[in-house]
UniProtKB/Swiss-Prot annotation:
ATP binds at residues 238-245. The lineage of its organism: Bacteria, Pseudomonadati, Spirochaetota, Spirochaetia, Spirochaetales. One of its GO terms (biological process) is proton motive force-driven plasma membrane ATP synthesis. CDD domains: ATP-synt_F1_V1_A1_AB_FliI_N, ATP-synt_V_A-type_alpha_C, V_A-ATPase_A. This is V-type ATP synthase alpha chain. It comes from Borrelia recurrentis (strain A1). The gene is atpA. Gene3D superfamilies: 2.40.30.20, 2.40.50.100, Bovine Mitochondrial F1-atpase, Atp Synthase Beta Chain, Chain D, domain 3, P-loop containing nucleotide triphosphate hydrolases. InterPro entries: ATP-synt_VA_C, ATP-synth_a_Xtn, ATP_synth_asu-like_sf, ATPase_a/bsu_AS, ATPase_F1/V1/A1_a/bsu_N, ATPase_F1/V1/A1_a/bsu_N_sf, ATPase_F1/V1/A1_a/bsu_nucl-bd, ATPase_F1/V1_b/a_C.
């Protein structure tokens, strides 16, 4: 029986609907008010009533307004043309919305996610008579720098036989590409695009693998000490102004991945505008073209309705899974998951659910876990491998890592990059705290060597805390040298200048080379007459290595500085 309903209550963006018929959880409905149709999603079903969260401002909705039930879940449209686009959480292209509406978006206006008129040059790889299943490739088109595979829609559950496929040529996303036949003789038309529900993980692959290949970000502190694996998960919690957004932008520019998906979820409009302005101007170091050519941005600012924040996170992960099915490596950056959790808290309060810690819903952990679990490395039907790596920034109030969102995230991620106010105020960027952060993945340097270096950082911090109480004269010269060595490692290796053309991105080879130099220095037993001599010598080493960091690797300037460094160390009768 087709469902029918009317509005019987409105609280903020939560609308209660009295209905007759059959509905399903997460079904999309349209509320008719003032000549507009406002999209909403059913989030609770009770006897004769449903509660729906509205993705628009609810001003003007009145008791008695008609509600149209679609019998469909919230979906995204998948096909060529997603890259270099900027969407809102409901996959409306924002540049086209701006053309239609101006600076202030009208509610109830929904546009097609893909350009219906653009023609793509299709190259067929399958042929008539081939047997196929969901996720198999029929052909490809060139999308920017990516070989965009045209696939059998993921909702096809059986094996099919191709009975018709078009020849190479130019087609739109709505043109018929192939006709397939099921075992019962039913025929199905395939186009370049199809829809997929955002809250349902894509499972059209053979098997999942354990992430073990390092995703090189070219940021020294991450790749060496707190690495991230392709298909892994990581979180970047930190207070406001600690550098989360810049770190994510640097990662997206330099990471060893094919495509970057950015979900700007509930961030301040200023930060989102900064991202939208900067990304088209950034040069992709791999291709020399604009970084936007392999980027898709899903943005919902804090001024947009809270329900759309959740939609933006799920839209981003679904698009990531779609490109993963082509055998590509995808990096999804969600900024910030705290805003999404706050939206859940707001909706949970309106539903009058029993609250958990700090009034967040009791199911917060399971929802966050289900999002991060959609990351992973998979083997596709044809044997190729694709991955989705998920990195979420968390914005705990006051930098308090004990709050529920951070704690729920820490339980499910494989790496923790904790930014601290202390390091950002000291202008030590990236402001990742080397004492609190951790990773479960393998890095670019041997584990034993990095643990030895981390032990120096811990010991150096202990000496530093002691000196704050008793002063420099209150510690032995040996402890003082340990402190100086830890500061040397911090300033020369853990810190990095994101705005320098050389130091912004450090290759795998260079990281290994420079770490080995510092590792030997940490292991060396220096003999000094007094603390003044120790400080002077270590400062000379520091300046020399900092200059090396800014010099092109193994070129004339770098080689000269390396000779100077070796001469400095030999002056202490050390064999380098």
């Amino acid at each position: 029986m087709e469902a029918k309903g009317k509005v019987v209550g409105v609280i903020g963006n939560l609308v209660t609907i009295e209905m007759v018929g059959t509905v399903s959880m997460n079904e999309i409905v349209f509320i008719k008010t003032g000549g507009q149709s406002l999209k909403a999603e059913i989030i609770r079903i009770r006897d004769g009533e449903v509660d729906a969260q509205v993705f628009e401002m609810t001003r003007g909705i009145a008791v008695g307004d008609d509600v149209e039930f679609t019998d469909k879940l919230l979906t995204v449209e998948l096909g060529p043309g997603l890259l270099s686009q900027v969407y809102d959480g409901l996959q409306n292209p924002l540049p086209e919305l701006a053309t239609k509406c101006g600076f202030f978006l009208e509610r109830g206006l929904y546009l097609s996610a893909l350009d219906r008129n653009k023609k793509w040059s299709f190259n067929a790889t399958a042929k008539v008579g081939d047997f196929i299943v969901a996720g198999d490739f029929l052909g490809f088109v060139i999308e920017g720098t990516i070989n965009h595979k045209i696939m059998v829609p993921f909702d096809r559950r059986d094996s099919y036989r191709i009975i018709e496929i078009v020849g190479d040529g130019d087609y739109t996303v709505d043109d018929r590409i192939a006709v397939i036949e099921d075992d019962a003789g039913g025929k199905h038309i395939i186009t370049m695009s199809f829809h997929w529900p955002v809250k349902v993980p894509v499972t059209s692959y053979k098997k999942r693998l354990i992430p073990n290949e390092t995703m090189v970000t070219q940021t020294r502190i991450i790749d060496t000490f707190f690495p991230v694996a392709k298909g892994g998960t990581f979180c970047i919690p930190g207070p406001f102004g600690a550098g989360k957004t810049v770190l994510q932008q640097v990662t997206s520019r330099n990471a060893d991945v094919d495509i970057v998906i950015i979900a700007a979820c509930g961030e301040r409009a200023g930060e989102v505008v900064e991202t939208l302005k900067e990304f088209p101007e950034l040069t992709d170091p791999r291709t020399g073209k604009s970084l936007m050519e392999r980027t898709c941005i899903i943005c919902n600012t804090s001024s947009m309705p809270v329900a759309a924040r959740e939609a933006s996170v799920y839209t981003a992960i679904t698009i990531s899974e779609y490109y993963r099915q082509m055998g590509l490596d995808i990096l999804l950056l969600a900024d910030s998951t705290s805003r999404w959790a706050q939206a859940m808290r707001e909706m949970s309060g309106r539903l009058e659910e029993i609250p958990g810690d700090e009034a967040f819903p009791a199911y917060l952990e399971s929802v966050i876990a289900s999002f991060y679990e959609r990351a992973g490395v998979v083997v596709l039907n044809n044997g190729s491998v694709g991955s989705v790596t998920v990195g979420g920034s968390v914005s705990p109030a006051g930098g308090n890592f004990e709050e529920p969102v951070t704690q729920a995230t820490l339980k499910v991620v494989g790496a923790f990059h904790g930014l601290t106010r202390e390091r950002s105020d000291a202008r030590k960027f990236p402001a990742i705290n080397p004492l609190d952060s951790w990773s479960k993945y393998r890095g670019v340097v041997e584990y034993e060597a990095t643990e030895y270096a981390r032990a120096f950082l811990v010991k150096g911090n202990e000496v530093n805390q002691m000196m704050r109480v008793v002063g420099e004269d209150g510690v032995s010269i040996d402890d003082f040298v340990v402190y100086l060595k830890s500061e040397l490692l911090d300033s020369c290796y853990l810190q990095q200048n994101s705005f320098d053309s050389v130091d912004a991105a450090v290759s795998f080879e260079r990281q290994n080379y420079m770490f080995n130099i510092l590792y030997k220095i940490l292991q060396s037993d220096f003999k000094f007459e007094n603390k003044l001599e120790a400080r002077s010598f270590i400062n000379d080493l520091r300046q020399n290595i900092l200059d090396m960091n800014l010099a092109p690797f193994k070129q004339e300037k770098f080689n000269k500085l390396e000779i100077n460094l070796k001469n400095l160390l030999r002056s202490k009768k050390l064999d380098f």
